[in-house]
Curated annotation (Swiss-Prot):
Species assigned in the record: Shewanella sediminis (strain HAW-EB3)
Cellular compartments per GO CC: plasma membrane
Topology in the lipid bilayer: Multi-pass membrane protein
Domain of life: Bacteria
Gene Ontology BP terms: regulation of pH
TM ranges: 14-34, 59-79, 95-115, 124-144, 154-174, 177-197, 213-233, 261-281, 290-310, 331-351, 363-383
Catalytic activity annotation: Na(+)(in) + 2 H(+)(out) = Na(+)(out) + 2 H(+)(in)
Name of the protein in question: Na(+)/H(+) antiporter NhaA
Residue ranges of coiled coil: none
Keywords, ordered alphabetically: Antiport, Cell inner membrane, Cell membrane, Ion transport, Membrane, Sodium, Sodium transport, Transmembrane, Transmembrane helix, Transport
GO molecular function annotations of the record: sodium:proton antiporter activity
Amino acid sequence: MERAIKNFLSQESAGGILLMIAVALAMIMANSPLSGMYQGFLDTEMQVRVGSLDIDKTLIHWINDGLMALFFMLIGLEVKRELLEGALSSAAQASLPTFAAVGGMVFPAGIYLLFNYGDPVTQAGWAIPAATDIAFALGVMALLGSRVPVSLKVFLLALAIIDDLGVVVIIAMFYSTDLSMLSLIVAGIAILGLVGLNRKGVTALGPYGVVGLILWIAVLKSGVHATLAGVIIAFCIPLRAKDGSSPSESLEHSLHPWSTFIILPIFAFANAGVDLSPMSFGDLLSPVPVGIALGLLLGKPLGVLVFSYIGVKLKMAVLPEGMGWKHIAPVALMCGIGFTMSMFISSLAFVGDAEAYGDFARLGILVGSFASAIIGYFWLAKVLPEVDVAKESKKGEIA
């Protein structure tokens, strides 16, 4: 189990660096003579037609609805594993990150709504600063190497997973519109099919893939966001087979490199390009970007710390061994790295006539996320013990 966690953490670390490169490239293209080509590329129409079934979307929608469904499937697999066998499998293990995650969603949303009070259009973005980007946050933490205790990494990982689960619930409840009953019925039948496969002990992934594709198409057509299909599929895939193997973990390990090195960087490149040329200084200080940036930079750490403190004081949660509040505080700041998850919610919150707010939202996400990353990194570096270079070198020679 420890080896699996280490492999996961190191892979997410490398992914964080790749995400930074993708964001930088998107910003350069969006603010250069290549901006027209960049936007035109994202607006390219792509159509899939099989008989009477017709799916016609722009490239950016294929990325957000299709590729991100695979990412959310990975989230579902991680959540299921941690709930059944991992860091969230007991009340004692799950209590502190659960308190922290809830506070880390409530406070940022409250700060955003405070800045956007009275405007029903911009209020739709209340959930944008409530998300944490697990890849980016772990990537920043990994820059400190062996100085970071495993308990601190597991705390951040568990918190981010619960946060992701909260985001899934938020999307299902608040960002699904114009529902199609026929498509929902087809989706319901597909879900029953997936549950049936699980109950019958089917461990081959092929049947889940076929029924899962039907579910994704039905959910896409239903008005509920298509990424939720990925989570449902993940929850239906068996964690353990009779021979002790794990179909769920096998798929999780297969999806990880695709998600880390392809899906998330593509998503970041497609969604992070903000054209700054038409913006004035007043636009930068408007309620949407300020509410998001402060929600991430102040709301996230405050929520994580306050709710964690309440949980500990009520004796409903305990700090992991070797961890103190001086460690929790900078990690709470790193939870303000919303980035890809926040951008994803932004793409759902500001659509149609409100789409113009999307650039403001992305700007707030970038400012809040990068500020949280920088301050969190230097704060954590200050409170962690220095590595004994001579000792580490000696260890390497012995190995």
